Every structure is written in C-alpha cells, then in structure tokens.
UniProtKB/Swiss-Prot annotation:
SUPFAM superfamilies: Cysteine proteinases (SSF54001), Myosin rod fragments (SSF90257). Belongs to the peptidase C40 family. It is found in: Secreted, Cell wall. Keywords: Cell wall, Hydrolase, Protease, Secreted, Signal, Thiol protease. Residues 210-236 have a biased composition (Basic and acidic residues). It comes from Enterococcus faecium (Streptococcus faecium). GO terms for biological process: proteolysis. Residues 208-397 are annotated as: Disordered. InterPro entries: NLP_P60_dom, Papain-like_cys_pep_sf, Peptidase_C40. The keyword Secreted applies. GO terms for molecular function: cysteine-type peptidase activity. This is Protein P54. Its main location: secreted. Residues 1-27 form the signal peptide.
Length: 516
C-alpha cells in the first residue's frame, strides 16, 4: 500500500514537472522579448533625443545668425548716418567753394596779366620809403600765401571727402556681401533642419505602437520628406542660378575683351594709314622739285602706295563695321583718320564710303530677298471644325495675376520688419514675397532670395510689370527682394526699424527682375 502511494506521488511529480517546464520557458521568452523591446524603445528614444539636440543646436545657430544680422544691420544704420553727415559736409564745402570762387578767379586773372615779379618791382619803385617798400612786399607776400593756402585747403578737403566716400562705399559693399552670405547660410540651415526633422519623425514612427499615432507620424514624415525634397530642389536651382550667372559673366568678359582687341586693331590700322599717307605726301612734295623724269617715277610710286593704303583703309573700315554690328557700340570703335593733304583724305574717304555703301546695299538686297521669300510663302487656311466650348482652364504655371498679387501685398503695409519672419506678425524681404505668393497662388517660391530667383524668367528692371519680383545683388548671390507695382515703384519689407512700405527705383535701384 505504501509502495503504491509512493509510486503515485512520484508519478504526479514527474507529470507536473513535465507540464511546468514549457510554461516557465514561455514566460522567460516573453520577459526576454519585453526586455529587447524596452531596449529598442530606449535606443530609439536616445536617438530621438540626440536628433532633437542637433535640431536645438541648429536653432541656436540660426539665432546666432539672427544676432549677426542685427549687428550688420546696425552697422548699416550707422553707415547711413555717416553717409548723410558726409553729404552735409560736402554741401557745406561746396557752398564755401562757390563763395570764394569769384575771388579766386579774379586773382587768377590778375596773376596771368601781371606776373608776380613785376608786381614786386612796382611795389618797390612806387614806395615812398624803404619801410613802405618792405611793408608792401610783406603785404603782397601775405596775400599770395593766403591764396595758396586757400587753394591747398580746398584741394585737401576735396581729397578727404572723396576718400571718405570711397571708404563708405566699400563698407556698404562689404555689408551687402555679408547679407548675401547670411541669406545663403540661412538656406543651408533650413536644409539641415529639414533633414533632422525627417530623422526625428522616422524614429518617432518606429517607436509608435498605435496605428493611428503611427499613421499621423508617417504623415508628418511624408511632409518632412516633401519639405526636404523642396529645399533640395531650391538648393539645386540656386546652384544652377549661380552657375548661369558665372557663365554670363564669363561671356560678357569675353565679348568685352574681343571688342577691346577689335578697337585696338582698328586704332593701330588707322594710325599706320595716317603715318604712311603723311610720309607719301611729304615725299611727293619734296620730289616735285626734282627733274621731270624723276618726278614721273616718284609720282607713279606714290600713286601706287596711296592706292594700296586706301585699299587697306577700306578693308579695315569693312572689318570695323562688321565688328560694330556684332559686339561693339559705334561710339567706341569708329575713329576718323586725319589726313595731311586733300588728295589722300579724299581718296581714303571715297574708298571708305564705297565699301560702306556696298555693304549696305548687300544687306538691303539680302533683306529684300528674304522678305520676298517670306511674302511668297502662302499657308492654306485650315478647314474650320466645330468644337465644343471648353471648360475654363486654370492659369498656367508661371502666369500670375499681378493685380491680385499687388492687392494681397498692400494688406500688409505697416507690418514690422523681422529678420527671418515669414508671417503677418513680422516679415523679412523674402518671407514677405513668399507669403504673398503662397496666399494668392498656393505656390511656394522659396524661403530665401536665391531660390526665388528661379521662380520665373529673368528680365530687366525696365520690363518688370505689376506682380513681378525685383532683386538686388548679382544672380545667385542676391540679398534683397521686392514685389513690383509697375511705374517704377515696388512694395517690400526694407530693414529692421521699418515697416512694409512702398519704395521707388529712383532711390533704391534693383539689379534685375524676374517675370512671374
């Protein structure tokens, strides 16, 4: 009996042990998975905290840039005051110069009529005594020295004013360059912050467990990625604008160099022709005194030389005309060739005029031929086919209602300037233009000046119409932007301490415009 009971107890123990071991193993496995998940969540939280720290560091850099910008703008304000003071000094100096101008001119005329040495002699000879003579000489010396000092002082004052103006302009250019660099740096920081926002939302999406929260985070991630892509596209367009500006500058320098070389070649050719013509004329005059046979031979030689020179002159004139039509203005290339004799001048002018007339006639004939060919081309009229009335199409991309843009911009007259501001609580120049276009068209033209250069077609300031953008600075390195009102006016957020207002190109002239 006891043995049977003992066997039953042992059998039960074995059975319980067999069942409990898998349960314990499963519990241990769950604990391990929970620990792993906790570790993963902790790692994600650490990564998210690190990303947040980087974002905060970048925000600190943006704040530092804001401070630097404020310092630069304060310096600009100081420079404007110094410039105003300098203008007043120049005005006062000019008034003093005008008051003394009559006296200086009178003394200059007297000095030309009577030289100083004779005046001194007259003073001595007409003196009543030796003391009188000495007094007169001293008085004349004092007057002459005073006049010389006066002229010298005026000269020194003018030089000092010019030096101050040059220094002031250099400082203003330096500040403009610094502002352009700040705009570029602001764009880089925005791009980095967008990248970090993508990282942060990605980590948050991995950490989220609830589907609704995860979906919301994924949406934010998609928005951040879209913002990242937009800023990268803006950076690409900005780089493209910089490269295009550099290419245009290189092409302009090449054209100017070619024009300078052409002008130099023409000048050398004209000088050579003048020298040879003068030598030929002088030689003919001297040889006319020789015997008849010698005169005949030398005259023949002179005529041949003159004919060759005139041909060279005509060729040079033709080349100069061709160069003028392609690259160089007329005023910078045309030079008159002086002649020492009537015959050489008449011959040269005749050849030049003939070449010019021939070139003009050829151009006219070609133009007439082209016009005739164009007029002879007849395009058959297409057969009209009835079509249903189309539905009104939206404005194409790049076509903007200028009146609507201007009306929206006028709503924010008086809004204070805030560097980096992008809403009606405060605008900077590019934030103002971006906000206005976003409200009217729903289009984001970029958060700083350089991407906004690529928002349309580059045109001259005189071609700008209402609603177009006006830029200050070179393409790819602009530092200010405004909205054109037409008629030489624009609306912009100017600088700290001022509000959104209307300005005029007469007082603050932009460098180029972009047609929207």
């Amino acid at each position: 009996m006891k043995k049977s009971l003992l066997s039953a107890v042992m059998l039960s123990s074995i059975a319980l042990t067999a069942v409990g071991s898998p349960i314990a193993a499963a519990a241990d496995d769950f604990d391990s998975q929970i620990q792993q998940q906790d570790k993963k969540i902790a790692d994600l939280q650490n990564q998210q905290a690190s990303a947040q720290s980087q974002i905060e560091a970048l925000e600190g850099q943006v704040s530092a840039i804001n401070t630097k910008a404020q310092d630069l703008l304060t310096k600009q304000d100081t420079l404007r005051k110094e410039s105003a003071q300098l203008k007043q000094e120049i005005k006062d100096l000019q008034e003093r110069i005008e008051k003394r101008e009559a006296t200086i001119q009178k003394q200059a005329r007297e000095t030309q009529v009577k030289n100083t040495s004779s005046n001194y002699i007259d003073a001595v000879l007409n003196a009543d005594s030796l003391a009188d003579a000495v007094g007169r000489i001293q008085a004349m010396s004092t007057i002459v020295k005073a006049n010389q000092d006066l002229v010298q002082q005026q000269k020194e004052d003018k030089q000092a004013v010019e030096a101050k103006k040059a220094e002031n302009e250099a400082k203003q250019k330096e500040l403009a360059d610094n502002q352009a660099a700040l705009e570029s740096q602001k764009g880089d920081l925005l791009a980095k912050q967008a990248d970090l926002n993508v990282l942060k939302t990605s980590l948050a999406a991995e950490q989220a467990t609830a589907e609704d929260k995860k979906a919301d985070l994924n949406r934010k991630k998609a928005e951040a990625e879209a913002e990242q892509a937009r800023i990268r596209e803006q950076a690409r367009l900005a780089e493209q604008a910089r490269q295009q500006a550099a290419q245009e500058k290189a092409e302009k320098e090449a054209r100017e160099q070619a024009a300078a070389q052409a002008a130099q070649t023409q000048a050398l050719s004209s000088a050579s022709t003048t020298t040879e013509s003068s030598s030929a004329a002088q030689s003919s005059s001297e040889e006319s005194k020789a015997p008849e046979s010698s005169t005949t031979e030398e005259s023949t030689s002179t005529e041949s030389s003159t004919t060759t020179e005139n041909s060279s002159t005509g060729s040079s004139s033709t080349e100069s005309s061709s160069t003028e039509e392609s690259t160089v203005p007329e005023s910078s290339t045309q030079e008159s060739t002086p002649a020492n004799t009537e015959s050489s001048s008449s011959s040269s002018n005749t050849n030049v005029n003939n070449n010019t007339n021939n070139s003009t006639n050829n151009s006219t004939n070609n133009s007439t031929t082209n016009n005739n060919n164009n007029n002879n081309t007849v395009t058959p009229a297409p057969t009209p086919t009835p079509t249903p009335a189309p539905a009104p199409a939206p404005n194409p991309s790049g076509s903007v209602n200028g009146a609507a843009i201007v009306a929206e911009a006028y709503k924010y007259i008086g809004t204070p300037y805030v560097w980096g501001g992008k809403d009606p609580s405060g605008f900077d120049c590019s934030g103002f233009t971006r906000y206005v276009y976003l409200q009217v068209t729903g289009r984001d033209i970029g958060g700083w000046t350089v991407p906004q250069e690529s928002a349309g077609t580059k045109i001259s300031v005189s071609q700008a119409k209402a609603g177009d953008l006006l830029f200050w600075g070179s393409a790819g390195g602009t530092y200010h932007v405004a909205i054109s009102l037409g008629g030489g006016q624009y609306i912009h957020a100017p600088q700290p301490g001022e509000n959104v207002k209307v300005g005029s190109v007469q007082w603050y002239t932009p460098d180029f415009a972009v047609s929207m």
